[in-house]
Curated annotation (Swiss-Prot):
Lineage of the species this protein comes from: Bacteria, Pseudomonadati, Thermodesulfobacteriota, Desulfuromonadia, Geobacterales
Function: Together with its co-chaperonin GroES, plays an essential role in assisting protein folding. The GroEL-GroES system forms a nano-cage that allows encapsulation of the non-native substrate proteins and provides a physical environment optimized to promote and accelerate protein folding.
Identification of the protein by name: Chaperonin GroEL
Keywords, sorted A to Z: ATP-binding, Chaperone, Cytoplasm, Isomerase, Nucleotide-binding
Gene: groEL
Top class in the EC scheme: isomerase
EC number: 5.6.1.7
Length: 544
């Protein structure tokens, strides 16, 4: 085992503090409407320009191993806040730095770090409760647009597009962000349920100009196995032909004579039919087929539950007002499923989302939920250059997360004002003297976000803090316009979830760092010098 270096007490805490300061100082320049950009070198391609705190934090790795530990712990604060609330990463970093800096001074002066941590925890609990009590539910399109605008660094276009997307697909809908091929940022919405499987043969197309198969008032056969034998399909095809309605077949695959017969019948005009592969794989495929069946009021024809393809009757088929199939996607609009069944399925998926520990599974479950209840919106981000595109796309994603957080838990006045208003709740706390020092750490640290916003705008932070502290309600400093306004009326708002998560995560990690008494790291290896080049071979003197 390699030799280790150990640092104790104040020496260790000072190393952590140096690392925390290095990372936080790089991140906090991005805070607020007048925050600056950070340019990050990339191994390939052009440098990355960003104003996103977590992106800056993730790029920082320090040479000194002990300082790097401090930096990595604060990086964890930014990442966790980003995961939970999707925004507020810079605020969380600023708070973590302030709490640790204030706390480490007290520990150096001989105070008990464990008691300080207890005081910090109790103060944070009180502040979080106060933030929830001053939080206001988000009501309309305008407020959603304001949250999006603030989080996208005051880009009103992005705020408006996100508000439109939320309005169209609802709270549960899926909103994805993609790079556009044009210069403008635009919004596309998909009604109904869409899945990424297109027609199995171009001969199924009904609109050659758009290369689409369009089925009006259609029946849907949903089967979980391959169909290659035509005789299994014949009974259901005969019944559909008699009804004169179009038919969509969704199966694991359709091949051989079955596919050939369907194409021939389509070309002869006997049947208006289209066949697509089932979406997803494995267990997820079964679940998605069941979703389609519930949405359209049909059944999955599966031998597992005793349904054979040759015994399928018309009442087992799903129904939909309109189905559109192109080479890549199938969209089912206005399915005939019972509302009670759909709501039951939605409840079941929500329960699975609560239980799952995998981010990937959660994302896939949310997609399924959106397809059942709302729909899907795609924001296509346009820009003049690739560098601008990446930066803008990151801002849109941040704004989208912040907007969802605002819909979840409501909004509080922005610009660091909510923290100052919540400070009064700490006066009611009656704690032992040592723990009271921890409360004082939080009192001082909660001034830091507004102080930093003012400093980034080129104004004296202390004057701004004092003026806002001595006023009431939502009165605060609008750094974008350099004026004091009612933050709620001016649309400068933060999602409560973001403010809450930033403080909780910052205090959690700062508390751990304060109670650190020893640090262990690998001893740097001394690189052996390169061996000298060997001499020339004998008899080579005459060579040129």
């Amino acid at each position: 085992m390699a030799a280790r270096i150990i640092k104790f007490d104040q020496e260790g805490r000072n190393a952590i503090l140096k690392g925390v300061n290095t990372l936080a100082d790089a991140v906090k320049v991005t805070l607020g409407p007048k925050g600056r950009n950070v340019v990050i070198e990339k191994a390939f391609g052009s440098p990355l320009i960003t104003k996103d705190g977590v992106t800056v934090a993730k790029e920082i790795e320090l040479e000194d191993k002990f300082e790097n530990m401090g930096a990595q712990l604060v990086k964890e604060v930014a990442s966790k806040t980003s995961d939970v609330a999707g925004d507020g990463t810079t605020t969380a970093t600023v708070l973590a730095q302030a709490i640790y800096r204030q706390g480490s001074k007290l520990v150096a002066a001989g105070h008990n770090p464990m008691e300080i941590k207890r005081g910090i925890d109790k103060a944070v609990e009180t502040i979080v409760a106060e933030l929830k009590s001053i939080s206001k539910p988000i009501k309309d399109h305008k407020e959603i647009a304001q949250v999006g605008t603030i989080s996208a660094n005051n880009d009103k276009t992005i705020g408006d597009i996100i508000a439109q997307a939320m309005e169209k697909v609802g709270k549960e809908g899926v909103i994805t962000v993609e790079e556009a091929k044009a210069m403008e940022t635009s919004l596309e919405t998909v009604e109904g349920m869409q899945f990424d499987r297109g027609y199995l043969s171009p001969y199924f197309v009904t609109d050659p100009e758009r290369m689409e198969a369009s089925l009006e008032n259609a029946m849907i056969l949903i089967h979980d196995k391959k169909i290659s034998n035509m005789k299994d399909l014949l009974p259901v095809l005969e019944q559909t032909a008699k009804s004169g309605r179009p038919l969509l077949i969704i199966a694991e695959d359709i091949e051989g004579e079955a596919l050939a017969t369907l194409v021939v019948n389509k070309l002869r005009g006997v049947l208006n039919i289209c066949a697509v592969k089932a979406p997803g794989f494995g267990d997820r495929r079964k679940a998605m087929l069941e979703d389609i069946a519930i949405l359209t009021g049909g059944q999955v024809i599966s031998e597992e539950i005793g349904n054979k393809l040759e015994n399928t009757t018309m009442d087992m088929l799903g129904r939909a007002k309109r189905i559109t199939v192109d080479k890549d996607n199938t969209t089912i609009i206005d399915g005939d499923g019972k509302e009670a069944d759909i709501q039951g399925r939605v409840k079941q998926i929500r329960a699975q989302i609560e239980e799952t520990t995998s981010d990937y599974d959660r994302e896939k479950l949310q997609e399924r939920l959106a397809k059942l209840v709302g729909g899907v919106a795609v924001i296509k981000v346009g820009a003049a250059t690739e560098t601008e595109m990446k930066e803008k796309k990151a801002r849109v994603e941040d704004a989208l997360h912040a907007t969802r957080a605002a819909v979840d838990e409501g909004i509080v006045p922005g610009g660091g004002v909510a923290y100052l208003r919540a400070l009064a709740s700490l006066d009611a706390l009656s704690l032992p003297t040592e723990q009271q020092f921890g409360v004082n750490v939080i009192k001082r640290s909660l001034e830091e976000p507004i102080r930093q916003i003012a400093q980034n705008a080129g104004v004296d932070g202390s004057i701004v803090v004092d003026k806002v502290k001595n006023s009431k309600d939502a009165f605060g400093y609008n750094a974008a316009e350099d004026e004091y306004v009612d933050m709620l009326a001016a649309g400068i708002i933060d999602p409560t979830k973001v403010s809450r998560s930033a403080l909780q995560n910052a205090a959690s990690v700062a508390g751990l760092m304060l109670t650190t008494e020893a640090m262990i790291a690998d001893k740097p290896k001394e690189e052996a010098p390169m061996p000298a080049m060997p001499g020339g071979m004998g008899g080579m003197g005459g060579m040129m």
